[in-house]
Regions:
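Short beta-strand-centered segments at strand-helix junctions
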Residues: 176-193
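Acidic two-metal-ion nuclease catalytic site recognized across multiple nuclease folds
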Residues: 227
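Cell wall/extracellular polymer interaction/catalysis modules
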Residues: 1-173, 190-224
Length: 227
C-alpha cells in the first residue's frame, strides 16, 4: 500500500490549484489539458480521501476516486468504481477461448464520454480519442477478481463500455452491476450530467497520481481566472 495523503488538497491551498496542477501533470504527453471543456480525472486504487491505496478487486464498491473539472467552478470530488463488480458473467466476452466469459477492466488512458441518456438515470458511452467504441482493456482470465501482470500484458478490447449508476442504484434502474463499465452514485452522475454532453476522461492508477501530486507546489492563493 502507498501513502495517498499527498493526493488530497491541504488546508490553505485552493482546490483549483491543487487538483488542476495534478491533472496538468497527468495529462502531459497525451494532449494539452483543455481549460474550456469539462474533464474527469479518474484515479483507480484509492478511495476518496483515503490515507492509503488498496488492491483493485472486482467488488461492488465505489472505492476509486473521480474529480470533475468544469470551467468556472471548483473541482467536484466523488467516489466511483473504475473496475467491474463481478468475477465472471455470462454477458461478458471470452477473452482467451477457454469457454468461460471474462469480465473487463478498462486500461488507463484518455477517453471521451458522451452523454447518451440523461433521464431518469444518466448514462455515458466511452470512446477512444479516435472515436472508436472498441476500448482497450484487461480481462480477468482466471476469474480471481483481480488483474495480474500476465493478464495485464494481453492487449484486449471491450465494447459497450459505459459510465452509469452502480450498486446503490434506485429500484427500477436498468444498471446495478458492472462487468467492465465505470460506475458512481446517482447523485454524483446528476452533477456530472450538468457539466455537458461531452467530457474528457483521464484514467490513471493511484500510484501515478500520487507521484504527480508530490510534484505540486502548494499555493494558498486562488487563481485570477478559475478554470
Amino acid at each position: 500500500m502507498t501513502d495517498a495523503r499527498p493526493l488530497w488538497c491541504p488546508p490553505g491551498t485552493h482546490p483549483v490549484n491543487h487538483y488542476g496542477m495534478i491533472l496538468g501533470k497527468l495529462w502531459g504527453g497525451l494532449l494539452p489539458p483543455p481549460t474550456d471543456k469539462p474533464r474527469i480525472l479518474a484515479i483507480r486504487g484509492v478511495a476518496l480521501f483515503a490515507e492509503e491505496t488498496h488492491e483493485v478487486l472486482s467488488v461492488p464498491k465505489y472505492d476509486d476516486t473521480g474529480v470533475l473539472f468544469v470551467p468556472g467552478a471548483e473541482p467536484f470530488l466523488f467516489p466511483m468504481a473504475t473496475h467491474p463488480y463481478q468475477k465472471d458473467s455470462r454477458a461478458a466476452t471470452d477473452g482467451n477461448g477457454d469457454g468461460v466469459p471474462d469480465v473487463a477492466t478498462v486500461r488507463t488512458g484518455l477517453y471521451r464520454l458522451t452523454l447518451a441518456i440523461e433521464k431518469p438515470y444518466p448514462v455515458w458511452v466511452f470512446a477512444t480519442m479516435a472515436g472508436s467504441a472498441s476500448i482497450p482493456c484487461s480481462r480477468d482470465l482466471n476469474h480471481d477478481g483481480k488483474i495480474d501482470w500476465r493478464e495485464q500484458e494481453k492487449q484486449l478490447t471491450a465494447t459497450a463500455i459505459l459510465l452509469h449508476v452502480g450498486h446503490d442504484a434506485p429500484a427500477g434502474s436498468e444498471h446495478r452491476s458492472s462487468i467492465g463499465c465505470a460506475t458512481a452514485s446517482l447523485r454524483s452522475l446528476e452533477v456530472i450530467a450538468r457539466a455537458g454532453r461531452q467530457i474528457l476522461y483521464r484514467l490513471v492508477d493511484a500510484d501515478v497520481a500520487i507521484e504527480a501530486a508530490k510534484l505540486v507546489t502548494p499555493d494558498t492563493l486562488p487563481p485570477e481566472n478559475v478554470t
